[in-house]
């Protein structure tokens, strides 16, 4: 057995471990298929018995034969039902368990995994690939058990009747083994490429569905059609290769069996001269019944190989290490003191570090603003606080304790994150505010959070209020409304540390007035990290850190940095000239004044 065959056997063996919890049901299905297969073998024996009886007994003495034949048919039917029904129960349970395990693993995987793998492939694995495994566990397994028993039963009968003649089947076994091994290897490789192409098509489709406005606005329809056409053509080519391999394999197998049966018939005419007519006909009947289960086993092998290829990709996901969570320290509510000591970080596969020797401290309740050009490392810093990525060097301390020492869930309980790209779910407004661990919040608490975030201003206009469905990712809401729901979620969480990552940069002036007013309540008595491009919104921060190429190049208050006439002063001057003082939202000025006070 070569390495590929061994790997395939190990994968299928691992797949069958999912059957173990349902071994009782599986045993019943095996019993049913044993009944089915037994009747196939007994049918050949019955033919022998009928012919011999016709030669030795009167017709009146054969009245039991129709009853015996009917009994075999009934047992055959009962066996078929029991085998199919209970194996179907096992297979649906296995697929359900595997699909849930894959989904649960997605919830445990680190952010770096999602960065490295596109969503289309990940979705295809939990839909299409699990479906391929279903075929391997259900139809193919059913065929292997049922037809395998039938083939074994017929071979036992043949060897019992005339073992010398039956050695013909032993002679062709090596040829069949080599053929099946070659075809299995080829089928598995092609199946994997077919599954990858389905993932690619899913990815392209998800992109055009999610970005249809951009596609239409920039005339990308033809480009997207070409992308999908190329992907679909590749899928078609691989699918045809798969079909061709299966189509050639079956006739070759039948040809080998036909040669063996022809030789067997020729030999039987000479070596079974002393046998009765019944023995001769019964033997040939069993021999000619044998190709059907062997052909079925050959076809089932195709489904098995496709299932193994699919299972391999699923097990790759399951074998991925989850987020590192070795910390044990827990606290009900931290004070909110954040300190960064000589922090450095480089993304996987990147040549340049994203952060270099970052050191600063945020006291409880302070507002720390991070500003600078895009790519300066501001968002990276926020991601490290949440432990979306493990930092390479240095320390991040929360209340004097290294964040890696905290239990991961407990650490994130202390943080509320609001991004520029708000994530909302295809659910009600209330369920989007009270999401995840916040689901236990009362109706009044949800309404209060929405009020404090100035979201009730638009929620009240809907007939169903907080129970209004907002569509996929909040498609029925404006940008400002979506942002206010994100702030309401942060308010409801009531975490001691708030991270605002470009929370207002994409909003119009009117929406920003609402958001800035809501931010005053959100940031009250919380340690806040504010990442902002609009410098007018962070003038009242306690400390402003100016970042450039992963380093802190300036730090101080707004007045101090303006007085330095350095990087911050130039950025501020550029924005002021570009937008003018009249474009600054009144609420932003109020926020600045309130923060300074």
Predicted feature residues:
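Short intracellular "coupling" helices and adjacent cytoplasmic loop segments at the cytosolic face
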Residues: 2-5, 92, 100-124, 128-130, ...
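Transmembrane helices of ABC transporter permease
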Residues: 21, 25-35, 69-72, 139-193, ...
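An intracellular "coupling" helix at the cytosolic face of ABC transporter transmembrane type-1 domains
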Residues: 21, 111-112, 128-137, 141, ...
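Helix-loop-helix
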Residues: 57-58, 157-171, 244-312, 317-318
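ABC-type nucleotide-binding domain
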Residues: 333-597
């Amino acid at each position: 057995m070569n390495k590929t065959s061994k790997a395939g056997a190990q994968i299928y063996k691992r797949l069958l471990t999912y059957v173990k919890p349902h071994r009782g049901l599986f045993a019943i299905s095996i019993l049913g298929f044993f009944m089915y297969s037994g009747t196939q073998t007994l049918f050949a024996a019955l033919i022998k018995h009928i012919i011999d009886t016709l030669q030795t007994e009167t017709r009146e003495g054969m009245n039991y034969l129709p009853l015996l034949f009917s009994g075999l048919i009934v047992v055959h039917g009962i066996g078929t039902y029991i085998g199919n029904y209970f194996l179907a129960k096992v297979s649906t349970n296995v697929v359900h368990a595997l699909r849930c395990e894959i989904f649960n693993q997605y919830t445990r995987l680190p952010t770096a995994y999602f960065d490295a793998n596109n969503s289309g492939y990940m979705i295809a694995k939990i839909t299409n690939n699990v479906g391929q495994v279903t075929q391997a566990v259900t139809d193919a397994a059913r065929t292997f058990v049922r037809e395998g028993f039938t083939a074994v039963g017929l071979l036992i009968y043949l060897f019992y009747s005339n073992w010398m003649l039956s050695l013909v089947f032993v002679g062709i076994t090596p040829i069949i083994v080599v053929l099946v091994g070659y075809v299995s290897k080829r089928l598995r490789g092609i199946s994997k490429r077919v599954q990858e192409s389905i993932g690619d098509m899913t990815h392209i489709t998800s992109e055009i569905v999610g970005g249809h406005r951009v596609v239409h606005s920039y005339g990308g329809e033809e480009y997207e059609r070409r992308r999908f056409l190329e992907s679909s053509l590749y899928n078609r080519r691989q699918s045809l290769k798969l079909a061709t391999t299966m189509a050639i394999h079956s006739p070759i197998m039948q040809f080998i069996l036909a040669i063996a049966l022809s030789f067997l018939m020729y030999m039987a005419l000479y070596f079974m001269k002393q046998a009765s007519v019944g023995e001769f006909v019964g033997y040939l009947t069993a021999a000619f019944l044998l190709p059907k289960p062997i052909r079925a086993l050959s076809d089932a092998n195709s489904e098995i190989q496709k299932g193994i290829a699919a299972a391999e990709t699923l097990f790759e996901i399951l074998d991925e290490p989850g987020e590192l969570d070795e910390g044990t320290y827990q606290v009900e509510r931290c004070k909110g003191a954040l300190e960064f000591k000589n922090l450095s970080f480089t993304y996987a596969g990147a040549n340049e570090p994203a952060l270099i020797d970052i050191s600063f401290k945020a006291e409880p309740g302070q507002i720390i603003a991070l500003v600078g050009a895009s790519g300066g490392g501001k968002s990276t810093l926020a991601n490290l606080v949440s432990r979306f990525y493990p930092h390479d060097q240095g320390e991040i301390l929360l209340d004097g304790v290294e964040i890696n020492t905290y239990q991961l869930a407990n650490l994130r309980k202390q943080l509320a994150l609001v991004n520029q790209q708000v994530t909302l779910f295809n659910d009600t407004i209330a369920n989007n505010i009270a999401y995840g661990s916040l689901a236990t919040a009362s109706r009044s608490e949800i309404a209060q959070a929405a009020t404090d975030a100035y979201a009730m201003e638009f929620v009240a206009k809907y007939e169903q209020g907080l129970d209004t469905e907002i569509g996929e990712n909040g498609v029925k809401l404006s940008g400002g409304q979506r942002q206010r729901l994100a702030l309401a979620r942060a308010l409801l969480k009531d975490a001691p540390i708030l991270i605002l990552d470009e929370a207002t940069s994409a909003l119009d002036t009117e929406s920003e007035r609402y958001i800035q007013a809501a931010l005053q309540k959100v940031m009250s008595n919380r340690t806040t990290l504010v990442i902002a491009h609009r410098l007018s919104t962070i003038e009242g921060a306690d400390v402003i850190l100016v970042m450039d190429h992963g380093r802190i190049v300036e730090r101080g208050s707004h007045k101090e940095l303006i007085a330095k006439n350095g990087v911050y002063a130039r950025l501020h001057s550029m924005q002021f000239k570009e937008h003018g003082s009249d474009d600054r939202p009144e609420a932003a000025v109020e926020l600045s004044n309130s923060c300074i006070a």
